[in-house]
C-alpha cells in the first residue's frame, strides 16, 4: 500500500519498486486528494519501468474518474472500498428510527430483503 501523504511521488515510486523487488504481487496506491491527477501521474511513471505488476486504486476521494480512464493509465484493479457500506447506513438509520417510533418492525417490512432472498444469495455464493 502506497500513499502520497508521506513524501510525494518520487518516494512512492521508490517504495513501489522496492516492494516489487521484495515480491509484492501488486501495488495499491491511494490519495486523499479530490483530483485523481497525482494517482494518474504515479501510474504513468510506474508503468514506464514496470508494465507487469498490477496497480490497484481505491477511488474514494477522487470518485469522478471512471474505470476506463484509470485503465488507460495502467490501473488493473479498482476497489470501491466503502461505497456500499456508506450507502447502507442511511437505510439502516431510517429503519432503526421507524422501529423506535412504532415500537415494532411491521412498518419497515417493505424496505427489507426477505429472509428467503438472503438465503438464496448465500447459496449462490
Model-found features: residue ranges?
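Alpha/beta enzyme core
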Residues: 1-80, 87-97
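Extended, intrinsically disordered, low-complexity segments
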Residues: 83-125
Amino acid at each position: 500500500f502506497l500513499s502520497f501523504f508521506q513524501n510525494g511521488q518520487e518516494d512512492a515510486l521508490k517504495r513501489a519498486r522496492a516492494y516489487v523487488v521484495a515480491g509484492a504481487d501488486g501495488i495499491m496506491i491511494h490519495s486523499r486528494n479530490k483530483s485523481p491527477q497525482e494517482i494518474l501521474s504515479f501510474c504513468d511513471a510506474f508503468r514506464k519501468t514496470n508494465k507487469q505488476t498490477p496497480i490497484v486504486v481505491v477511488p474514494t476521494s477522487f470518485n469522478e474518474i471512471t474505470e476506463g480512464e484509470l485503465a488507460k493509465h495502467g490501473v488493473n484493479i479498482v476497489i470501491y472500498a466503502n461505497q456500499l457500506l456508506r450507502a447502507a447506513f442511511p437505510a439502516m438509520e431510517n429503519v432503526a428510527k421507524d422501529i423506535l417510533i412504532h415500537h415494532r418492525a411491521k412498518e419497515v417490512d417493505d424496505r427489507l430483503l426477505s429472509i428467503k432472498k438472503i438465503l438464496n444469495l448465500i447459496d449462490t455464493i
